[in-house]
Amino acid sequence: NVDVNKIRVSIQNYGSSGNDLSGPSVFFYEWPTNSGRGYVAYQALYVGAMVTTDGGEERPLVTITHRSDQEGNSMMWEPVPGYLNPNSTKIAISDDESTWPPSWPDKSADENDPGWSGSWNGYFGKNQFNAGQEVFYKVSDDRNYIVGHPYTPDTTDVTRKGAGILVGVRAMEWKQILIEDVIFLLHEVQNDG
């Protein structure tokens, strides 16, 4: 949950925030914090693309949350491994070092400090704690597919499906009076296929 200012909300690491009905400790967008008043129930990331099937046909593909095929296999945004502490039940959040991964996969190429081990992967840079609270994770659409229309979005990894999309997601709150009623949700969408 992010709750450092007057908004409290639960963040899920599959592209959504708010109350996904998964339990009593999951919060909708509550304002002010601890008032029980909800203003937004749920927010989710939707991304659509036209993909070319192996047969040369163009088909639409939209990735959303809470979607599965008839066998129960996920077809939704899924967390990219490595962006949370595997020994924690929480998402990586700036004000709780126990939620951070041992190293950050997207920082492994840093020549001076590969993986930024023991450091926060902040929007404003390494160990930059500008926001009162900041959540960071990545999702991919690798499990989504078009039923009955095979295609290969990434020729370097044929196990991937979806549109080959990676999304870096951040939620940030500040306690400063001018923005104490605001949460910033940033979605950095990358075509990785």
Regions found by a protein language model. Name each.
Residues N1-G193:
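A long-range scaffold signal marking pre-active-site subdomains of enzyme folds
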